[in-house]
Amino acid sequence: CKGKGAPCTRLMYDCCHGSCSSSKGRCG
């Protein structure tokens, strides 16, 4: 999974913590 601030997609489990911010395109 991806860490905070990492570029991400809209996949729910793409980020280790929290979810992907669709506006910034980064993990929150």
From Swiss-Prot:
List the GO terms this entry assigns under cellular component, sorted alphabetically: extracellular region; host cell presynaptic membrane
Q: Which cysteines are joined by disulfide bonds?
A: C1-C16, C8-C20, C15-C27
Q: Mind telling me which residues the site (Essential for calcium channel binding) is annotated on? A: Y13
- Cysteine amide PTM positions read C27
Residues with the Methionine sulfoxide modification = M12
Presence of keyword Secreted: yes
- Cell compartments where the protein resides: Secreted
Q: Which UniProt key words apply to this protein? A: Amidation, Calcium channel impairing toxin, Disulfide bond, Hydroxylation, Ion channel impairing toxin, Knottin, Neurotoxin, Oxidation, Presynaptic neurotoxin, Secreted, Toxin, Voltage-gated calcium channel impairing toxin
Tissues in which the UniProt entry reports expression: Expressed by the venom duct.
- Give the Gene Ontology MF terms in alphabetical order: calcium channel regulator activity; ion channel inhibitor activity; toxin activity
Record InterPro entries: Conotoxin_omega-typ_CS (IPR012321)
Residues with 4-hydroxyproline modification: P7
Q: Which family does it belong to?
A: Belongs to the conotoxin O1 superfamily.
Look up the further comments and give them: Found in injectable (milked) (IV) venom.
Task: Present the record's domain note.
Answer: The presence of a 'disulfide through disulfide knot' structurally defines this protein as a knottin. The cysteine framework is VI/VII (C-C-CC-C-C).
Role = Omega-conotoxins act at presynaptic membranes, they bind and block voltage-gated calcium channels (Cav). This toxin blocks N-type calcium channels (Cav2.2/CACNA1B) with high potency. Unexpectedly, it does not show any blocking activity at amphibian neuromuscular junction. In vivo, when intracerebroventricularly injected into mice causes shaking activity, and, at higher doses, causes mild tremors. When injected intramuscularly into fish, it causes paralysis, and, at higher doses, causes death.
Name of the featured protein: Omega-conotoxin-like CnVIIH
| Annotated source species | Conus consors (Singed cone)
